[in-house]
Amino acid sequence: MSDFTKFLTTAPVAFILFSSFVFALFIEINRFFPDILTF
């Protein structure tokens, strides 16, 4: 049961870190290469 509670505490933290990294990457790509849908 301790492994399950450890998963419940680490999974949201890992998801928040990963999603914030991906969102920041998308923002930086759109900052340097705007209108990427027109290529």
From Swiss-Prot:
Q: Name one GO cellular component term.
A: plasma membrane-derived thylakoid membrane
The portions of this protein that span the membrane are 7-27
Q: Which residues form a coiled coil?
A: none
Task: Name a biological process GO annotation.
Answer: photosynthesis
Membrane topology of this protein: Single-pass membrane protein
**What is the first-listed, main subcellular location in coarse terms?**
membrane
> Where is it localised?
Cellular thylakoid membrane
Q: Which InterPro entries match?
A: PSI_PsaJ (IPR002615), PSI_PsaJ_sf (IPR036062)
UniProt keywords (A-Z) are: Membrane, Photosynthesis, Photosystem I, Thylakoid, Transmembrane, Transmembrane helix
Pfam families named in the record: PSI_PsaJ
The family note in this entry says: Belongs to the PsaJ family.
Q: What does this protein do?
A: May help in the organization of the PsaE and PsaF subunits.
Q: What is this protein called?
A: Photosystem I reaction center subunit IX
Give the gene that encodes this protein: psaJ
